[in-house]
């Protein structure tokens, strides 16, 4: 439903926004030192996340970066929270809603379906803000974000948590996603039916094959019974 414009300036501009906030609030290091330290911390966190499928909040990344640079700010400090907000503000510039997303959710609600979102993201509050900004939040019964429950897709725990919040069994649910390893495999492993939005040509093995493949979100309405 939500896509990110991953152009060449995306990551760098988000990081510069964090640095600008920190520089204006007493953190006296060069951008080069900050960037190098941040990228090292991020790499270490990503490696742990990929092994454990646990999702720490983005503020952990900021706090650990600052501590390595000699500034003892924990995740609850106003400085770390402000840096996270700076990141979020810049990030929002690169997010856009999939065409017809609101209409699809509205039609599904009219047909009597409960809907939810499972998102792998380290800034939960930003996800809520984005969903609200694009008029999607009011059509969702459940919103599950990895950093809120410290589990990320394809961990079965995050899918089961969402199912429990919706009050449905896996066999009654359909999961729609655009990645095989994260979305489709994870949902299949807990017994959900799956729909792959194939945004680009994908080599699909028999063990990863979704129940349905569509080209755009609006095609989902041709699959879901009236």
Annotate the PLM regions.
Residues 4-9, 25-32, 102, 106-109, ...:
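Asp-based, Mg2+/Mn2+-dependent phosphohydrolase catalytic module
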């Amino acid at each position: 439903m939500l896509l990110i414009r991953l152009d060449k300036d995306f990551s760098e501009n988000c990081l510069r926004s964090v640095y600008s906030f920190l520089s204006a609030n007493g953190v006296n290091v060069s951008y080069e030192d900050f960037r190098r330290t941040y990228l090292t911390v991020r790499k270490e966190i990503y490696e742990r996340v990929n092994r454990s499928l646990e999702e720490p909040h983005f503020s952990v990344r900021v706090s650990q970066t600052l501590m390595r640079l000699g500034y003892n700010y924990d995740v609850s400090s106003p400085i770390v929270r402000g840096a996270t907000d700076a990141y979020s503000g810049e990030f929002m510039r690169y997010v856009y809603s999939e065409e017809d997303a609101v209409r699809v959710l509205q039609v599904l609600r009219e047909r009597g379906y409960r809907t939810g979102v499972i998102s792998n993201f380290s800034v939960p509050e930003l996800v809520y803000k984005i969903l609200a900004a694009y008029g999607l939040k009011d059509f969702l019964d459940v919103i599950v974000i990895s950093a809120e429950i410290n589990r990320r897709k394809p961990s079965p725990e995050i899918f089961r948590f969402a199912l429990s919040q919706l009050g449905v069994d896996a066999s009654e649910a359909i999961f729609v996603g655009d990645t095989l390893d994260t979305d489709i495999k994870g949902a299949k492993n807990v017994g959900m039916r799956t729909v792959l939005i194939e945004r680009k040509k994908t080599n699909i093995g028999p063990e990863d094959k979704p129940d349905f493949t569509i080209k755009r979100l609006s095609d989902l309405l041709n699959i879901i019974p009236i």
